[in-house]
Amino acid sequence: THKGWRCSAAQAYLKPARNRPNLRIETGTHVTGLLFEGRRVIGIHYVQDGVSRSARCRGEVLLAAGAIQTPQLLQLSGIGPADLLARFGIPVVHELHGVGENLQDHLQVRLYYECTKAITTNDQLNSLFGQAKIGLQWLLYRSGPLAVGINQGGCFMHALKDERGRPVAATPDIQFHVSTLSA
């Protein structure tokens, strides 16, 4: 949130930067691969309105296409395990094991607790008065439940431990979210 307003990444970061001279925003596009000069990435290939195009960059190219499409674009561009790329007839630009591997599901278990007092956001939202109060709190002060995200806190921890109580993995294996609202 920014000043009590929930917003997207586009609203928070892209909109304020959209008039920069070194930024060009294209919409309705689909990136199909990386553009190389030797082994250096200098841009991207993309399709817009059925037409193949490319965009070049004089500086650094940052690929941020999400957990699934980032490795897909790397592989389609020739970066990844050579044996996998060869199976699909993709020329190897840079053999890099691990690209496209180790994707893990993000399972979630929800635990609900009942409060003995009517103090939860759900309790406040269950009445017209409570809804009006929360709405006014946000309108007048940009604070309250409408000014923050759903998950108020979170952490990563080691749940799996050996017989001495030490973590069995180098990285955390469980994630917690604390939310003030339930469905």
Residue ranges and their predicted role:
Residues 1-41, 45-47, 110-135:
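Conserved redox-cofactor binding core of oxidoreductases
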Residues 26-27, 63, 92-95:
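General beta-strand structural signal in soluble alpha/beta enzymes
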Residues 50-68:
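Core beta-strand elements of the Rossmann-like FAD/NAD(P) dinucleotide-binding domain
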Residues 60, 67-81:
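Alpha-helical support elements that line or immediately flank enzyme active sites
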Residues 71, 81-183:
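Mid-to-C-terminal "cap/lid" subdomains and adjacent gly/pro-rich loops that border
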